[in-house]
């Protein structure tokens, strides 16, 4: 049973999948940082200093000035957070699109290469004749 599990776990596809998941997690963190630390501040500057992380509609309770305080007071719609996550998604989707496009292009190049021509029957027969002739002389 342990041997079967080891064969299953160490198959190429399983290891590739595990590596992909780990790299994907790291890539997600990188995209979050790019969006939160670079893109959103630039968008905030362009839009007159709007802080998207603190944009919300408070549905209940006394009006609050921060999203955290509004969430403690009651239900809120955090649309600024949604905008940030939407930008995250679009960046990840775009990068994945580019990766898949590149892989498809490389795959087409690989398929386009013609297979080496097989030697003709005459060439093979000539080689066999030469080998037999050498064996008879020896």
UniProtKB/Swiss-Prot annotation:
Keywords on record: Cell inner membrane, Cell membrane, Ion channel, Ion transport, Membrane, Transmembrane, Transmembrane helix, Transport
Subcellular location, principal: membrane
GO molecular function: mechanosensitive monoatomic ion channel activity
Membrane topology: Multi-pass membrane protein
Cellular component, GO, one term: plasma membrane
Location relative to the cell: Cell inner membrane
One protein family per Pfam: MscL
Top-rank taxon: Bacteria
Family membership: Belongs to the MscL family.
Function comment: Channel that opens in response to stretch forces in the membrane lipid bilayer. May participate in the regulation of osmotic pressure changes within the cell.
Name under which the protein is recorded: Large-conductance mechanosensitive channel
Source species of the chain: Brucella canis (strain ATCC 23365 / NCTC 10854 / RM-666)
Gene of this entry: mscL
């Amino acid at each position: 049973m342990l041997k079967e599990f080891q064969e299953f776990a160490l198959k190429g596809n399983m290891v590739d999948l595990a590596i992909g998941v780990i790299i994907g997690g790291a890539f997600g963190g990188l995209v979050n940082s790019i969006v939160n630390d670079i893109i959103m501040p630039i968008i905030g500057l362009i839009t007159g200093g709007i802080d998207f992380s603190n944009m919300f509609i408070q549905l209940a309770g006394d009006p609050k000035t921060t999203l955290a305080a509004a969430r403690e007071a009651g239900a809120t719609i955090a649309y600024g957070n949604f905008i940030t996550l939407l930008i995250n998604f679009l960046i990840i989707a775009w990068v994945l699109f580019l990766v898949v496009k590149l892989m498809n292009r490389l795959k087409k190049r690989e398929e386009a290469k013609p297979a080496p021509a097989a030697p003709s029957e005459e060439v093979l027969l000539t080689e066999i004749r030469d080998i037999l002739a050498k064996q008879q002389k020896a």
